[in-house]
Amino acid sequence: MTNSRRDFLKKGALGTAAIALSGSTSGAVAGILESRTQKIPHASHFGAFYAHVRDGKIVDITSQLDSDANPTVMTRALADRVTTDSRVKYPAVRKSYLEGKGRGDLRGKEEFVRVSWDTALDLAANAIKKAQKSGGNEAIYNASYSVWSHPGAFKPNVLAGRFFNQIGGAVATAGEYSNGAAGPVNTTVVGDMEVYSIQTAHEQIIANTKVMVLWGADLYKTNRGGYSVPNHRCYDAYEEYKKAGIKVVLIDPIYTTTGQEFKADWIKIRPGSDVAMMMGMMNYLYKSGKYDKEFLEKYTHGFDQFLPYLLGKTDGIDKTTAWAEKLTEVPAKTMEDLADLMVSNRTFIAGNWAMQRAEHGEQVDWSIITLASMIGQVGLAGGGFGFSMHYEGGGDAASGKRTVGGLSQGKGGAVNLTIPASRMSDLINKPGQTVSYKGKTITYPKVEFMLSAGGSPIGHQPNVNELIEAMRKLDTIVVLEPWWTPTAKMADIVFPATTTLERDDIASGMSYSNDRIYAMKQVVKPAYEAKDDYEIFTLLAQRFGTEKKYTRDRSVKDWIEGLYSKSYAKREMNISFEEFWEKGSVHYEIPEEARKFVRHEEFRKDPVSNPLKTETGKIQIFSDKFASYNYDDFKGHPMWFEPKEWLGNKELVKKYPLHLVSPHPTYRIHTQLDNTWVQNVHKVQGREPIRISPNDAKKFGVRDGEVVEVYNDRGSILAGVVVTNTIRDGVAAIEEGAWYSPEDSSQKRPRCNSGQVNVLTSSRPTSQMTNATSANSNLVAIRKIDVLSPNLAYNPPKIKGAWDENDFTKIINNISYN
């Protein structure tokens, strides 16, 4: 039996990655080929796998089924990253920069020149020294926001931070794009970020939960990939959820994969209005007397300071369900029925991260925590709340044992300045201006030099055109990348880095279960002139006299063995490094006690002996610290703030009638894999899909499969229409992560022909509290388009002096032997 690509992909959201070598080859030949094939263990953000290598080439990828319970199709696309035409093959420098002319305005427009490694390294080192001399190390911006580049210890952002900190430091980022609004608030409200904390075990939810409210959480989609190496066991747990008969309610403008799998009741909330719905439900619970007064008194602080606002005594607006209905477009009775359902059953609220990536995103988790406190089930088995069930297999029981850590970045040296992660464009555009962050004021320095290793600023920063305009103001941009990403094309100096398949590394299995260590063995030799990030930064360190400090005279393999030596596997299980490396992984057993874990249980049992790390040791419904900041858009208790850009803005919606959301991708992690064959599964005419409802398709006169222009004041993109009943009217969804492809780089705001959604998203900060990203607060319009320009996102730029392997063949074929 053969496996067609269609058959393979029909296996759906998970699919199997264990496709056998072709059965059409005769037995004898197959045996010979098999004997010449190496099976090398490796691991990725998509799962652990074996690369089958023959004659130095990857011929197949199969999942490590003992480690990956439900493999994803994405694992099989990893081989394509090695051989793709978009590889950076050798060091390259932008033409005008190499000629000493600078011309930052030509970034992304002109050709590159192939240079030697020494030339590129010397140019980069000289640019760093020039910036240091001109403005000190505050003139250097380490933009290596690349924690998701791969799951190994040698992450490019760590290696970059280590290098800069040993030469005096650099401007870096505070907070993050994922949870920039919620994390800093939660630490004050409940004494923990919560978004990365171990969740109540699946076993406890299966045994005790009667109602699960998915407030935007899409467990099935987002658990396909992980920060570390996923085991995908959570999908087996979800099957048990179904068998347990848990009633699931989904509050989301999209009827997600998870909603469909659980046959959830779908509440089609208007994007950006979630806090209003929570306020309405809390108002109803209070007035009906159905809230848990005892829990509030014993375990929380400041409800009495929040209550006047909830009842409208401070602002004249009673936050009733009728009030909330006008904002959310959710019927008041639906909210009241849901509140009744939640207080009368053991209920678990699964929050998500997308809601807080919106204007006033700081309010979302705080409001969920307050609602959960009024329900009174926090700390009970199967009850309470969790903000990480959709991440890293949240709910998996933890081994409690040490796996492997990473390299140290060291201290920041003379410079220890950080800016909120999403303020990248402002940092460059607004030197000398200030930004607030968690009660402090930060002054932007004048940045001249920027380095990005393994990251994708043009992939993750909202308002791409604003960012590109900023990047063209810098003196020098250096990028370390295996591929000609949109960010690499905007650089002055580009170093070709290896993919993980071309170097050794070591990784841990799942942030929560923490039950495996993986050998990420080198599978094939580095392609072309690529070097691994560790070697590149070592060569740069040589030019600053810090090489010995950077490497400590250790090779990559030395570091890997050293990291492994501190693990439970080595210290307690006595498994030698050689044995581990040969086998490819080590597995820890999960203790049965871990399957009984209930988040916040110890606090509930004895809040005096087990206080939260907050101002009062309790849940802070009101925080004196927050109130002391005196911000006009963030106060001492959770509040509803109306967004500037949403469907409730009656004037703006006349021009841009669709609310655009940008969920995580189904077949990528952010921008990763967008240059591989797996993207053909869902692209529409080579563009990123835009999902709209049948009513909106009719309203705009577009059909399924057509390409449309999506636009607002920030820019425009091409996207392929997918008409679906799984999205509410008035909302459009374009998954984030497509590679940027400007149609005409000479224009100030060129149309993106690939469908990169961040061309359209707003860089408006959430509030003065965290200045985090509000990328889900956007309005757009769409229109039909007849003439389509090509999507060139994956094409390398023109490179002078480049040598194409095909050139030799062409020359030979043209030689005439007389």
Question: What is the role of each PLM region?
Answer:
Residues 2-290, 331, 539-542, 698, ...:
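N-terminal export/assembly segments and adjacent metallocofactor-ligating motifs
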Residues 19, 172-173, 291-294, 335-336, ...:
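Acidic/polar loop patches that form or flank catalytic/metal-binding clefts of enzymes
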Residues 97-119, 288-331, 523-620, 660, ...:
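N-terminal leader/propeptide and maturation segments of large enzyme subunits in energy/redox metabolism
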Residues 156-240, 244-246, 250-251, 275-279, ...:
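Extended redox/cofactor-interaction regions of prokaryotic respiratory oxidoreductases
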Residues 257, 485-519:
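Flexible glycine/proline-rich, aromatic-decorated loop/lid segments
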Residues 263-268, 502, 515-526, 677:
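Short beta-alpha connecting loops at secondary-structure transitions
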Residues 281, 302-424:
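Active-site phosphate/pyrophosphate-binding segments
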Residues 533-583, 671, 677-691, 695-818:
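Long, contiguous, secondary-structure-rich segments that constitute the structural scaffold
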